[in-house]
Amino acid sequence: MDPAMELTERKFRHWCRLVESHSGIAVSDCWADFARRRMVEHQSFSRQPEGGREHLQALVDRLLIKETRFFRHPPSFNYVASVLSGDSDVPESDPQSEPPSGFSLWSVGCASGEEAYSLAMLSEQLCQAGKLSSPFRLLATDLSRSALDIARCGEYPRSRLRHLNAMQHAWFESAGDKFLRVRATLKKRIVFARHNLLDSLPGKTFDVIFCQNLLVYVAPTRRKMLLEKLA
């Protein structure tokens, strides 16, 4: 018998509701089988919700697929570059103005850090080109503790960086035969922190908010609310 069948439909839906109320993550039909198996693996379905917050958080961590890579979806990063450099058609930008000083960025749902480090590399490149004034700061947040541990460590398999160009590769140093490590000069630009978007927002404003990894997990009815909250 398929072990995932041991989880009754009623119990499965109950845990889906708990997960969404805790994290905003909606288990849609297209990945319900995956979620069932993760619940069985974690044995969370057999626990009472009272006093089980840590077990619920661990389940949420299992459900987050954490699919990401450096400079994922290049058009998004190209647009950020145009905004930072004042070359976009955003009304607030002024091509004749001085480069922004003290620029701040927020990577929402940064997963294992590739997105945040990509934004940092892009910003450093613009600084070196005189299109953005240092220092800039970057906040990178995620709900997954395990993903944030990887992000803070900043070590990635060499195979994950093969598509980067020479300028981007220069921000890494060797960490053994199979891994590369983000250099401290780039890492110090980023603060990694655990954050749930259902909670209050960080107590500051940001010039750029990047959230392309996040909305896939959120129910359509909640997406508009979150986007308005971020705006």
Q: Could you describe each region identified by the protein language model?
A:
Residues 2-106:
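Conserved AdoMet
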Residues 25, 66-70, 112, 199, ...:
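Short strand->helix junction
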Residues 43, 123-127, 155:
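Conserved hydrophobic residues forming the short capping helix/wall of the S-adenosyl-L-methionine
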Residues 78-88, 116-127:
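Short, well-ordered amphipathic alpha-helices
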Residues 98-119, 136-139:
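Conserved class I S-adenosyl-L-methionine
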Residues 108, 129-210, 214-222:
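Extended basic-aromatic, gly/pro-enriched interface segments that bind polyanionic ligands
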Residues 224-231:
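A short glycine-rich, Lys/Arg-flanked "PGG" loop and its adjoining helix->strand segment in the class I
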